[in-house]
C-alpha cells in the first residue's frame, strides 16, 4: 500500500467526512464501515512505517512531530504535552498524568482539548459530553466485569497449551530477531499480575487508593528473585491467578466502580484496572505462539 500519494490521503479524509455525514443522517451501520476503513488504512500505514524505519530515536521523533503539529496549528497544548512527555522519557521516567493530560476531541469538528471538557466546543458549540476521550490504551474499557473474570480464567489455560511439551532450553531461547524468550514473556505476565494483585488489595482496603506507576516491562529480563525454571514461573502465575479470581468473584458488583488515583493515568476504577490487565495479557499470546513455532522448527 503506497501511502505517499495524494489519492491515499484524499481517500482517508473522504472516509472520515463520509462517516460524519452518515452519522448526522442517522445511518450508523454504514458510517461504522467508513470509520473502520479509515482506521484500517491508518493502522496499516503505521504498521508498515514502523517496520521500514528500523531503530529510531523515539524521543527525537516525538519532538519532531510536536514541531510539525505546531506548524499545522493542530493544538499548541498538545504539542507542549508531547514535549513534556519527550523530556520525561529522555530522563528515563514515565510521564505523569499532570505532564500528559488526557486529550478530548470534539466528535463534530475535531477541536482538541487537554484535560476535562467543561465548556461547549470553542469551534462548533458542541456539548462537553459529546467529546471523545482518548484513553492511554484500549485495555481500560475492553472488558466488563464478568467478561474480565472469564478472560482471566481462560488466559492461563491458553498459556499452558502454548508451552506444553517445550523444554526449559527452548523456553529460555531468545527470539530469532532479538527480544524476549518465552521465559521472559511468562515472567512479565507474572510480574504484571503481581501489580494487579497488589492494587486489588489497595482497592479492598482503602477508600481512594493512590496507585504508583510501575515500569513492569523493564523487569522481564531480571533474574533475581525468580523461580529457577519457566514452568515454576508459570505455576506461580497460575496459583496467584486462582486467588485473584476468588477475590474478584466475591466482590459486590458496585465495588468494581470504586476509583483510585493512578500516577500515570489519573482517575481509574477497579473495573478499568482489571480490564487493563486481562486485555493486556492477550497481546502477549501471539508473541508466545510465535516463539513456540520457532522452538518447534529448531528441534
Language-model regions: role of each:
Residues 107-110, 119-126:
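Short, cysteine/histidine-rich loop/knuckle motifs that typically chelate Zn2+
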Residues 20, 156, 160-167, 194-197, ...:
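Structural signal for well-ordered, non-membrane alpha-helices
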Residues 19-26, 163-166, 170, 295:
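Secondary-structure edge/capping motif, primarily at the C-terminal ends of alpha-helices
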Residues 125-161:
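Short microdomains enriched in Cys/His and/or Lys/Arg
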Residues 1-45, 160:
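General detector of N-terminal leader/presequence modules that precede the first folded domain
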Residues 141-145, 223-230, 266-270:
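A short, mixed-charge helix-start or loop-turn motif at secondary-structure junctions
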Residues 2, 6, 31, 60-103, ...:
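Short, contiguous alpha-helical
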Residues 47-88, 105-108, 155-156, 160-162, ...:
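Acidic/histidine-rich alpha-helical segments that form the ligand environment
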